[in-house]
Structure formats: structure tokens, C-alpha cells
Amino acid sequence: FRGAVLLDQGEFSLSGSLRINASGIVLRGVDKVKTILLKKGVDRGALIYMEGTDDLKIQDTLQVLSKYVPVNARTLEVASGTSLRKGDRILVNRPSGKEWIASLGCDIFGGGISALGWKEGDMDLTWDRTVTEVNGNQITLDAPLTVALDAKYGTSSVITYQWNGRIRECGVENMTLI
């Protein structure tokens, strides 16, 4: 944690956006009603951006072997030969295939206009997790998955990565943003 930038009470007008591009920085007001950041002008961009460097490097992609992983599960089985270790950061990816989209009725939106429906790959879900345990091909995650992984709708995957430019432990608190 680097520290907090404390803004006193008052209205602070901005003609552009604020950017936080390093880890451990908190922008803090003294009171959520009395500290106000007001963005003026015609710029429609965000008031505050928290952005690191887009240098994500995919290292390996492992197939999820579990046929069905229920909502709130924290364990899943991955392809053999895994090099995963406790503490590894991973992405769990659930594809949005045609069958899944059709099962939700989102492939067409009626009125004879099928171009508006969801397309394969448009609604893939990805969770960022940490491996807390490895037991053979079974891995345990630090947090549960919020949607089931069902092999009948496509093969999910576990992706190992390195992301040196990613920022973390940043925040905005106790202020009104307008």
C-alpha cells in the first residue's frame, strides 16, 4: 500500500479524467456528501481511470475435464500434466457456444431480426482466481465460480498467465462523483 490522497471537503471541478496507474493508491474524501468531484465539459469518458499496463501474457491453457461444475464450486478437474501450483493466478474461461445461447433463447430477439441475437463467443465468462490447492488433476480455487460449467455447452478452460503491469489494491472512497 503506497498511501491515500486525501481531498478535503468541497467541490473539485475537473476538465478531464483522473488516472491512477500504480498499485496501492486510494483517492479518499473526508465525507461522501461533502467531498465532490465534478467533471465539466463535453468529454464523455470516465471521471476516474484505474489502469495498469496491458501486458497480459498467456502461459498455458488447460482443458477442464469435469463434465459439470455447479454454481459455487471451488474445485475442478483439469487435463493431466498440469504444472499448476498453490498460489498460481489463473483465469477460468467458460465459452458461450451456440447451444448455450439457443438454450437461453438469446440467439434471436424476435420480429424476424436474427442479427441482434448473441453470437458465439460474445458472452464468454472469465473468472480471475488463485489456486489454493492442487491434488493430482484436481485444483481448488480461492473463490467459487458464479455460473455452472457444463461440458454440453462447450469445453471450459483454465488459463495460466503473467501480468506484470496489472495494478491492485486501489480505491476511491468517501466522495460523490458527478
Regions found by a protein language model. Give the residues of each.
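Cys-His-centered catalytic/binding microenvironment captured across papain-like cysteine peptidases
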Residues: F109, I113-D128, T132, Q138-I178
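Residues embedded in well-ordered secondary-structure elements
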Residues: G16, L65-K67, E120, Y161
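N-terminal extracellular ligand-recognition/capping segment immediately after the signal peptide
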Residues: F1-V26, V30-D43, T82, P95-W127, ...
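Short, well-structured alpha-helical patches and their helix-loop capping segments
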Residues: Y68-N72, T82, M123, N164
